[in-house]
Each structure stands twice: as C-alpha cells, then as structure tokens.
Amino acid sequence: MLIQIIEGVYRLLWGDLLTLHLGNVTLSLSFMVILLLTAGVFFTLRTRLLPVRLFRDMLAAVCEKNDKGSGLSSFQTLVVSTATRVGMGNLVGVVAALSVGGAGAVFWMWVTALLGASTSFVESTLAQKYKQPDHLYGGWRGGPAYYLHTLAERKRGRKLRRSVAACLFAVSGLICWCGISQVVSNSVSEAFQNAFSIPPLVTTLVLTALAAVIVLRKEATVKSLDVMVPIMAGCYFVMTLWIILTHLPQLPGVFVQIFSEALGLRQAVGGGFGAVVMNGIKRGLFSNEAGSGSAPCAAAAAECDDPVKMGLVQALGVLIDTIVICSCTAFVMLLAPGSVTSGLQGMNLLQAAMQYHLGSFGVVFIAVTLALFSFSTFIGILYYARCNVAYLFGDSWFWQTAYKVLALVMLVVGGMQAYTVVWDLGDVGIGLMTIFNMLALYPLSGEALTACGSTKPKRNSSEQKSHRPRQPMAFVLCAVTQPHLEVVVAEADQLPAGAVLSQRPDGRQGHSVEGVVLAGGVDGHIAEDEPVALGRRGVEAVVSHDIAREAGRPAEADGAGLSPGSPASSRGGGRASQ
C-alpha cells in the first residue's frame, strides 16, 4: 500500500504533464521539469548570467577564512554540500540518467547545472540571511523552512510559532533524505556484491554500523567530511581524467552522441526525446540539488559577513558537481563499447565500463569509491536534516537522535529493496521539497538579487581594504515607525553595500528592523554620519561612533521580519536601545 502511494505521488510529480509535438519529435514534460527550467531561466536572467559574470568572485569566496571561531567556513559549507552532491549524484545519479535517458541526458544535466547555479545562489543567499543561532550544536542553522517561516510572518503581519509551508518543506526534506538513505545502501550493497561477492545484507549491516558510530556523535559530522570529501573526489577525478585522456580520439564521437540524442536527432531510448530531457533534468537535480532546498541548510551554517558570498560558494558547488564530476562519470561509461554496457542498469553499468577500462581493478575501485561517496552522502544529509528537525520539534536532542536512528533503519531497508523502489521515494521527497522551496524563492528573490547587484563593487573594495587604516567599531542606527525611535541593528565597521542588517525587536517598543544596505560610503562602504538606504522601505541608517562607544558591543541578529518603517533620517537625536 505504501509503495503504491509513493509510486502515485511520483507519477504526479514526474509523470508527463505537457506533451508538445514538434514535427517528428514528441516532447513530454513533467510538472517538475517545467518548474525547474522556468525557475532556472528566470533567476539566470535576473542575475545577468551569474555563473559567467561572477565566476571569479565564486572562487574568491571559497578561499575566505573564518576567523570568528563559530559556525562553518566557506570551504566547509562547500564540502558539506559537495559531499551529498558528489557522493550519490555523480555516480548513481549519472548512471540512472544514462540507463533510462541515454547519452543525451548528459546534455540536459549540464543545462540543469548552468541554470541551477543561479537558483542555488538565490536560495543559499536567503538561507544565510535568515539563519538563526543553533543552540544544540553551536554556530548557525537555517534553510528554506526558516525563510518560508519569515515569509509567512510578513504576510500575516504577526509572529508565528510554525508556518504550514515551512513545516511541509521540513517534512518533505526528511522524507527525501530517508529515500536517499535507501539509495545509499542499495547502491553500495550492489557494488560490493559485484566486486567481492559479498551478500547485500552483510554489506548493509556493516555500512549501517560504521555510519552509526559517526552520526550518533555530536560533532563528528563536518570534521569527518573535511578529510573525506577532498581526498575521495580528487582520487576519482584523477582516475576518470586518466581514462578520458587515454581515449582522446574517441572523445569527439562521444560529444556527437550526447548532442544528437539530447536534441532529438537520434533516438536512443524507448521514451524518445521526452525521456531524455526528463531523466537528464531529474538526475541533474538529484546530483546538484539546485532549487531543491537541500544545500541552503549547509549555507546557513556558515559564519559569513555577507550572504552574497555564501550564495556564490553554493553556485560554484553546482558547477563543480555537474559540469566537472558528472561529466567524468558519463564519459567513462560512453567511452566503453555499447556491447559492454548493453542491458545493464544501476551500478552494474558503471562497473562494467570501469572493468573495460581498468580490468578487475576498475570494479574494485568503483565499489570502494562508491562506498566512500555514499558514506559522505549519508553524513551530509543528516547535517541537512538536523535543521529541519529543529524547526519542527525545537531544540530537542531526543528528536535529533530519533531521526538519526530512523535514517539508519532506512539504510538497512534500502539494502534489501529493489533498485527502482528506492529511487521513487527519494524522487518524491526532492520533488515536494522543490515545490515548497519555490513558494519562497520567487517572493524573496528580490533581496538576493538586490545584494547580487552590488557584489562587484564590494569585491573591489575588499581588495583595497588592506591599504586603508582600520576604523573604530561602529553601529548602524535606524529610525523606524516612530520619528525619534532609534535601534542598534548591526556592527558597521567596514560594512559594505549589500550587507544584511537585522536586529531583535526592541523589548519595550516591539519594533524590528531588517533589510539590505543598498548604497553608501566610499567604494560602497558606509562612512561615518552618512545616510544609507536600507531595503525597499527607504529607511535611512547612520553610523555613529559615539553611540558605539556607549553601546559597547554589537547586538546579535536573529532574522526578524521587516518593520513597517517609514523613511526618516536618524541623524541627530535619540539614544540607542541597549
């Protein structure tokens, strides 16, 4: 009964919704494909081709260090999100795409990545902006559930304990990650059975035991990934690159096959052109997670002074995942003769291709690599899950541990299930997550896009920062609602245009301030006593070193909603609330 429900929801999300007849070609598109392509095109145009225009900024953002000691660094957030992207998506996801969609699916995975990079930028920027303190694990937490909650509060005009849309996203995420847990154990057990003739039950139980040792501890998750992901991704990339370089004469033929099947010039699968497009986009989403709302959970955990930087980091992760690593996997399989991989699916297909290229070592190499990739994926999705568990149940170690135990149980179940069944649950979960995530991305995207517009000046300013004497610590003051009410909202030392300002409501007056600095200061930075436009409301802010000395230290932000403030100047008058 449960399997029938899962399959029914799967057909609703990923089944044919729109059929287009283009000459001799029939294109059938699902609801999810239409949703993702529309969002990708919209955000790519709105960000003015962000993957190309700001590629240098993406690399610079990854290299920044976290000197504050709390939260994750930019590199760590990239590692966590890459752990889940590179883990299952680049091996199992690509294999699934080629098994059903043929070589043309690779092209549509590339399209999904190029369009999805802008979507990932928007959702990760919003996640960083609306993050909250993590009282259980320390640092920060956030994600779509949290900015969906903020959006609901704005529409209702009052504080809410829970938002229906946010709860639905959180539940969808937990369902999705249970499904991915099954895919993890199913793929690893199949690979080890082919490589070492180990029964699936034995592999599954050993994998579950090793996972339990790590995930049931409090702080081992990210530290484990810091070491595991760069090493395993590097080894896999070098090995596949060597295979590609030794088959360079065949590479043009592979590209011809990819593009001809992708554009419907050659039919290679039973479902025709529509199957190629749908499976390429579906597995592209599973691989790079753009738009699904998974990666923002990692982006929110970063200690970052500018949400735009974290958006750029996650956009780069999408490109690394699909354009680089996924392509390596696809080329390895497509460079093998069709007679080697004909009739195979799942990990059998990839292992057969690797055996052709590397002999028996190739089968063992893929089995071990997949085990490490899958292990990192499982750790990464539990890192995502804890943000959503916290939103649903609050700061509770009991519920955090309960979900970890459930995920471990799903590992065991997945090792015993059929290949298609375990994929359906993951696809249902990721589809529902994407729908609820989009409910917030469109209304809130203006904030991320406004900040994105000032990214270039900020980067140039930061390059010159070392040549300017450091200014004393200062605070931004904002006038809200009442003409003479001033609230300390953020530390203003080296505060650039595009930075996000947020402050708890004043205890006596009940007002809150939040917004994005639109302009101000020399080279985009706020100068002392200079009015600054804040957000769309036109609230003016002013830096006052005198108030900073009285306040003593910056107040903490918590992502409160925008106040109904009217444009007013805070210059001259009032004292800051402390």
What are these regions (language model features)?
Residues 464-480, 561, 567-568, 573-576:
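N-terminal amphipathic/hydrophobic targeting modules at extreme N-termini
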Residues 49-74, 96, 102-106, 118-160, ...:
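Flexible loop linkers connecting adjacent transmembrane helices
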Residues 35, 43-59, 165, 173, ...:
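Membrane-interface loop-to-helix entry segments
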Residues 115-123, 203-218, 229-249, 282-285, ...:
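Selective recognition of specific alpha-helical transmembrane segments in multi-pass small-molecule
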